[in-house]
C-alpha cells in the first residue's frame, strides 16, 4: 500500500480518482 498523502476522517478521498481508497483514516493506493 502506498499512502496518497490525504486523510479521509471527515471527507472521502478526493484522490480516489487516482485509485486511492480509505483505510484507517488515511487514503492508500493498493
UniProtKB/Swiss-Prot annotation:
PROSITE patterns, alphabetized: CYCLOTIDE (PS51052), CYCLOTIDE_BRACELET (PS60008)
Tissues where the protein occurs: Detected in stems (at protein level).
Parts of the chain that traverse the membrane: none
Domain of life assignment: Eukaryota
Cross-link (Cyclopeptide (Lys-Asp)): 1-30
Family note: Belongs to the cyclotide family. Bracelet subfamily.
Domain notes from UniProt: The presence of a 'disulfide through disulfide knot' structurally defines this protein as a knottin.
Annotated protein name in UniProt: Cyclotide hyen-H
Protein source organism: Pigea enneasperma (Spade flower)
